[in-house]
């Protein structure tokens, strides 16, 4: 579903940061200021968000993986919820340095988590002493919190979707190093450099974050549905061709 200007206004997407904290590189996307707060030009944001959705749609249609990143308190739950709805990996607790640039190490931790989860399923906890079980539960909880959202990510993602580039500077830097496209919400106090698909907007409002994350998840689901429809249509076309030549 396409996001409208009205939805953006209602979610407060246009509210930037205090003028004294601004990044001059965001000047092209700023409409003006009110009460020492920068106002983002939604006439720029809307088409840029639409472009980002279009890219996401195409990537999803080609079975691409998009990693959702949002670890701030106001975005944590939404990021997990929308990524799961779209069947995509996510990081919503803390970005561990090297999550992409040192994927081999991450794979070791993922294997450990999966082995531990399998042990729980097999009833191994019941065979442990109280102390062993407690330490085991603590470790599995820690792993689930830090890497649970990426445990089914088979490799480096095809793109990352980030809410707040300043807060997730390491994630953006890692993506840039590997040539992984970055789709990101950039507020008036940060630089849009290193971002392939810039979404100029408020990165603090939970309503705004929900709007972006839902929009990206919707685009992923639409892209997948379109790909399935194309396969069905192609199969029908082949059937008709066979009948005509029978």
Curated annotation (Swiss-Prot):
GO biological process, one term: translation
Taxonomy, superkingdom: Bacteria
Keyword presence, Ribonucleoprotein: yes
GO molecular function: structural constituent of ribosome
GO CC terms of this entry: cytosolic small ribosomal subunit
Keywords: Ribonucleoprotein, Ribosomal protein
Sequence similarity: Belongs to the universal ribosomal protein uS2 family.
Designated name of the protein: Small ribosomal subunit protein uS2
Source species: Burkholderia ambifaria (strain MC40-6)
């Amino acid at each position: 579903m396409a996001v409208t200007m009205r939805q953006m206004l209602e979610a407060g997407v246009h509210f930037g940061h205090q003028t004294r904290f601004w990044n001059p590189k965001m000047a092209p996307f700023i409409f003006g200021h009110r009460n020492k707060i920068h106002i983002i030009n939604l006439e720029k944001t809307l088409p840029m968000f639409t472009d980002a959705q279009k890219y996401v749609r195409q990537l999803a249609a080609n079975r691409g993986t998009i990693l959702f990143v949002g670890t701030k308190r106001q975005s944590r739950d939404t990021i997990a919820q929308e990524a799961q709805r779209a069947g995509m990996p996510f990081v919503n607790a803390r970005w561990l340095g090297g999550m992409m640039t040192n994927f081999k190490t991450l794979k070791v931790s993922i294997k450990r988590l999966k082995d531990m989860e399998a042990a729980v399923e097999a009833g191994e906890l019941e065979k442990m002493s109280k102390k062993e079980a407690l330490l085991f539960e603590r470790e599995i909880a820690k792993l689930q919190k830090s890497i649970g959202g990426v445990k089914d990510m088979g490799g480096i993602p095809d793109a990352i979707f980030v809410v707040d580039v300043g807060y997730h500077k390491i994630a953006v830097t890692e993506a840039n190093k590997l040539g992984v496209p970055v789709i990101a919400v950039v507020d008036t106090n940060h630089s849009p450099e290193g971002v392939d698909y810039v979404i100029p907007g408020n990165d603090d409002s939970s309503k705004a974050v929900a709007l972006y994350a839902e929009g990206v998840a919707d685009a992923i689901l639409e892209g997948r549905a379109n790909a399935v429809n194309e396969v069905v249509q192609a199969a029908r076309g082949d059937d008709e061709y066979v009948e005509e030549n029978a």
